[in-house]
Regions:
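N-terminal segments that cap or nucleate solenoid repeat domains
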Residues: 2-33, 72-95, 99
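Ankyrin-repeat boundary/"N-cap" motif
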Residues: 2-10, 33-40, 63-68, 91-105, ...
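Ankyrin repeat A-helix N-terminal signature
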Residues: 10-15, 44-50, 68-74, 102-111, ...
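Conserved ankyrin/ankyrin-like repeat signature
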Residues: 19, 52-53, 77, 110-114, ...
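Ankyrin repeat domain, specifically the short helix-to-loop turn at the C-terminus of the second helix
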Residues: 22-29, 55-62, 82-88, 116-124, ...
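Leucine-rich solenoid repeat scaffolds
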Residues: 37-58, 193-221
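Alpha-helical adaptor scaffolds
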Residues: 127-131, 135-155
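Ankyrin-repeat and related helical/solenoid repeat scaffolds used for protein-protein interactions
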Residues: 161-202
Length: 221
């Protein structure tokens, strides 16, 4: 007999929301299942770009954990978690991220509000993920193209020239992704437009290659 947990994660990976809903209807406890890496079903779905499935799973859960609440931008649930256990603002997920990394990367719901709440509770704006990605929340926000979260993190003192593996700065990611507002905020906060990644590429070169002419002009000014 197929393990129901395996069936759930198989359905998530296949993007089969109907199958997920059927499995959860038959066994609501499956919503609390975790994959082989200890990642919850809702987060597993988000990592695979399956937001609708993540929302379906979240709707069945009696309570979201701090990472799920942060990732889905559910500030009411997040505030309740932080009020009960303030230390959750600095705890790590099974895969090495802080809760602040999740609204920064996913940008779902009230991601900016979730970020502010976590920072107010003591989250480290410059915390690096304890995994091979070794990213700070600002890297996550610029990679995800979430200008509002970028602004929150910069206002909280994020290191605008911090490097992630391969030498990428937040400005590299924002320029490549065409996030004009984020590029503007990063420059205003002192980001170095001449910074090169490990293969010698600057932000303006990435913007030019991607056809982001307005950002090229901004970086040239």
């Amino acid at each position: 007999m197929t393990d129901p947990g395996s069936s759930l994660f198989g359905a998530i990976d296949a993007g089969d929301i109907a199958a997920v809903d059927t499995l959860l209807a038959n066994d609501r406890d499956l919503a609390a299942a975790r994959d082989g890496d200890g990642v919850s079903a809702a987060m597993h779905a988000l990592y695979r770009g399956q937001r609708a499935i993540a929302e379906s799973i979240a709707a069945v859960l009696p309570e979201l954990d701090v990472f799920e609440a942060a990732a889905l931008g559910r500030v009411d649930r997040l505030r309740a978690q932080l009020a009960a256990q303030p230390a959750l603002a600095t705890t790590r997920s099974a895969d090495g991220f802080t809760a602040l990394h999740f609204p920064a990367f996913f940008g779902i719901g009230d991601a900016a509000g979730a970020s502010r709440d976590l920072l107010a509770a003591g989250a480290d704006v410059n915390a690096r993920s304890e995994n091979s990605m070794s990213v700070q929340p600002l890297h996550s926000a610029t990679a995800g193209g979430h200008d509002d979260v970028v602004a929150v993190l910069i206002d909280a003192g994020a290191d605008v020239d911090s490097r992630q593996p391969q030498g990428w700065t937040p400005l590299h990611a924002a320029a490549m992704n065409g996030s004009f507002r984020s590029v503007d905020r990063l420059l205003a906060a002192g980001a170095d437009p001449a910074a090169r990644n490990d293969v010698g590429t600057t932000a303006i070169e990435l913007a030019r290659a991607a056809g982001h002419d307005a950002i090229v002009a901004l970086l040239s000014s």
